[in-house]
Amino acid sequence: MKYYLKKCWPTVTAASICMVVAYGLQVCTSLVQIQITQGLLDGDLRAFTIRIILLLLTWLAVVLCLIAETFFQGRAVRRMNNALRRDMAAGLLHKTHQEYHKQESGEYLSQFTNDVNQIEQMAWTPFFTIMGSAAQVVFGIVALASIHWLLLVISLVIALVMIFVPRLFSKRLGTVGTACAASQADSVSKIKDLLAGYDVLRFFGKDERFTSGVDAASDSMEQAKYKLTINKDGIGCGLAYVSAVCQVAVVILLGVLILNDMIPLATFMGTGTICAGVYNGLNQVSKLAVSFSASKPYFDKITVHAGEAQLPDFGLPTLQEGITVKDVSFGYDEKKPILVHMNAEFKKGGKYALTGPSGCGKSTLLKILLGWLPGYQGKVLYDERDVRDYTPEQLQQKMSYIEQNVFLFNTTIRENITLGEHFTDEQMEKALRDSALAGDLANMPQGLDTPVGEEGNALSGGQKQRVAIARALIHNRSILLVDEGTSALDQKNADIVEKSLLANPDLTLILISHHLSDERKAQFDHVYELTPASSIV
């Protein structure tokens, strides 16, 4: 929490100063009210009138400060929330492929939405409120001290009580807050799963399952929030009662002081208001300190800050000789190996195919080459250097991976191909031609600027794969790994794409296919046929 407050210190400081000044002026209004009362008791009309005008001006200043505080607080919260999401994104980028896929995308979505909302409610808003409440307490105590020193003493004692009592409950709220965060992430993931399966459930008439699933996930989320709220508010109510008892004690002290002529009668009205402000402020500080404890689990999830712990900045050397797979074994489960003592060699500029039934390790091999699955036995050499010496990010500077299930961003075809980079018209035309996408664009009125829809649902499966191939080609990756990347294409377009890839002398191609004709096999330098849990040589 402190990290983000410091990061956005200009707007945080401006909002805090406005809040402090506003609450300080509110205490001044109580002192002015004491003087107004004294003017009435003395029958001094002039003093009464002047104090009334002063009171109105003071309240005007309070309102102006609060308006300014709202402006600066809104900017500060926006910047801190943006910083939170940047750090969450940086944390995801620092995960390995395996680490990232250990969690559902719904859980990550929950962090970017629910977690940020919870932090805003339990950390940012309470922080600014505490600044005002603390100012109210400090200025109130100073005002009470100016009236009589005994009021200062009792105020300090009560302040200590109100500060230390909430600490008794911080651990409990931290535990409840952690459970709430986990429940929300799980619920969002379940709702996302139901939304993704909407068509399947409707097709089989499972409307009730959709409704009940959403209801169950929603209730789980709300139950966790309810438990957190009950704990927070229950503790807050207890603290409010302690504050009320303290306030009554001060009223009793005021009565004793007035009855003994130690302070004027006029002070009773204003002093009561100041005391109420002090104890309400203390109560607020206590309750909000508890809120900070509940927000801690959300901050604990953020372990990386954007701009820190940068990845290695040196690039991957251009492939000179080739990639060698030596005696590689791998299994997601130790008892069920997928690859056993694999040996393969992929020369620079060569064209290779991997064939075999499902589950024999074809896709697994590509992911090992990409550095996504480092837990294998044996060696994978990139020009005689172990690929473990490189990060996946470095390997992907020279490699591109096209899989059967293509993901497209909800933007235009152009943006999905270029990913925001600038390319010449010649580069674009070549990528469109070599990917067999040019023919599709000719039938689209908006051409490259055609929106693809959410997850590319405005395009056919074959069109999406052609966009993915064009994306890989235009970014000039010299090593292309294709995992059934032409499976959704008709035979004519598949032939066009594969012919273009096979004819490119600068491209090292490793292509997965379940079925290859003898004619097509002859066009590859080597075809590796895999069988489940076997070796290839």
Language-model segments: what does each one mean?
Residues K6, H97-Q98, N114-A123, F127, ...:
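An intracellular "coupling" helix at the cytosolic face of ABC transporter transmembrane type-1 domains
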Residues K7, T11-G24, L55, V62, ...:
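Transmembrane helices of ABC transporter permease
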Residues P10-T29, L40-N82, A266, G270:
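Transmembrane-helix motif of ABC transporter permease domains
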Residues R86, K379-L381, D389, Q396, ...:
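ABC ATPase nucleotide-binding domain helical subdomain, centered on the C-loop/LSGGQ "ABC signature"
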Residues L93-V138:
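Juxtamembrane loop-to-helix connectors within ABC transporter transmembrane domains
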Residues K206, I230, I274-H305, F314:
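Cytosolic ends of transmembrane helices, especially the final helix of ABC transmembrane type-1 domains
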Residues L370:
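Helix-to-loop junction immediately C-terminal to a conserved catalytic motif
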Residues N405, I413-N416, T450-V537:
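ABC-family ATPase nucleotide-binding domain "signature/switch" substructure
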